[in-house]
């Protein structure tokens, strides 16, 4: 099972509060493990202007209002930009399933600040990571549902609606989900 480019949708039984109602885009997945970015946990207290100011990068007012998201609990001081594929860093962009790009280098922030970045982007601090077999085990234990990622769901919907819309894409009404899971 290759989950690269798929969305993980947290089940109500998710015990870790950092992942409660989380929607995660899986950016890399192999037998060695998985890496993803939470796309629906904005950090209202941190704007991209704070990050750009720390890095001494000048930007327009529009750019400065961009919200930074909590990408996951691993390396929370490290920045990632999840973006549309109209942009590729000359240094290092990971193309995720042909549909998304992920860049973690300074040049993308400079280009976003200068208005030359990707058409769609989410700035993240941190990421979610799993060791080999760990994510597959969590899915088997009913911790996550998986669904296809769409640009609309990832970039266009407000963060507060992404979890319920990801469930709706599977034909699941969140109201009908139970925090208790079992196996038939």
From Swiss-Prot:
Disulfide bonds: none annotated. It comes from the Bacteria. GO terms for cellular component: cytosol. Belongs to the UPF0301 (AlgH) family. NCBIfam families: PRK00228.1-4. PANTHER family: UNCHARACTERIZED PROTEIN YQGE (PTHR30327), UPF0301 PROTEIN YQGE (PTHR30327:SF1). This is UPF0301 protein RD1_3419. It comes from Roseobacter denitrificans (strain ATCC 33942 / OCh 114) (Erythrobacter sp. (strain OCh 114)). The lineage of its organism: Bacteria, Pseudomonadati, Pseudomonadota, Alphaproteobacteria, Rhodobacterales.
